[in-house]
């Protein structure tokens, strides 16, 4: 039963890491990356639809994204969604495809993005600590219900803290890696 609490916490930590990884992938680092467009929703026939379901996204050059809509009639909707997004990149529509030229990051923009990375990393740490709190509460409930002894509770709490520390170290590593990527020219 005690192992189930730790396994559940580990699974939730892994989900947090995956979520953080996706979040970091969508923060542009001066290079074209199709994951920059993962959060773009296009109003397609009145329904919000993810861009990657309406078009193929390729990277023909280091700083260029090429969006080729499956349905050419959706090109205006896609362009409208890109203009409305917070990417800060103006799409170039040539009638059949849309080109996004990723501008080189200025020093100021790099620092702003690094701050954003730290903020996102801090939010991930908060999520990890909330998961730890839930696991500790579950352990205390088991001890109250006399399913585990007080000594087992102390051991379980130490184990939960150890996996929590490991999860936070991983977040710190991911954050430092993304910051390094952003700040290197």
From Swiss-Prot:
UniProtKB keywords: Cytoplasm, Protein biosynthesis
GO process annotations (BP): translational termination
Repeat among keywords: no
Principal localisation: cytoplasm
InterPro entries to which the protein is assigned, alphabetical: Ribosome_recyc_fac, Ribosome_recyc_fac_dom, RRF_sf
Domain of life: Bacteria
Keyword Cytoplasm recorded: yes
GO cellular component, one term: cytoplasm
MF-aspect GO terms: ribosomal large subunit binding
Compartmental location: Cytoplasm
SUPFAM superfamilies: Ribosome recycling factor, RRF
Record-stated family: Belongs to the RRF family.
NCBIfam families xrefs: frr
Main function: Responsible for the release of ribosomes from messenger RNA at the termination of protein biosynthesis. May increase the efficiency of translation by recycling ribosomes from one round of translation to another.
Protein name: Ribosome-recycling factor
Origin species: Streptococcus pyogenes serotype M28 (strain MGAS6180)
């Amino acid at each position: 039963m005690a192992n189930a609490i730790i396994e559940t916490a580990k699974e939730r930590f892994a989900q947090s890491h995956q979520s953080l990884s996706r979040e970091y992938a969508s923060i542009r680092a001066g290079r074209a990356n199709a994951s920059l467009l993962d959060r773009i929703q296009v109003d397609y026939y009145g329904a919000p639809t993810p861009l990657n379901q309406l078009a193929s996204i390729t990277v023909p050059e280091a700083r260029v994204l090429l969006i080729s809509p499956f349905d050419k009639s959706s090109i205006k909707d896609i362009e409208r969604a890109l203009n409305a997004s917070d990417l800060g990149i103006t799409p170039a529509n040539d009638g059949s495809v849309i080109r996004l030229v990723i501008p080189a990051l200025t020093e100021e923009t790099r620092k702003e993005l690094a701050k954003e990375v730290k903020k996102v990393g801090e939010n991930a740490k908060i999520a990890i600590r909330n998961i730890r709190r839930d696991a500790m509460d579950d352990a205390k409930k088991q001890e109250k219900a006399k399913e585990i002894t007080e000594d087992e509770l102390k051991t379980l709490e130490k184990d939960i803290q150890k996996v929590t520390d490991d999860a936070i170290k991983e977040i710190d590593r991911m954050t430092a890696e993304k910051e390094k990527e952003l700040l290197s020219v």
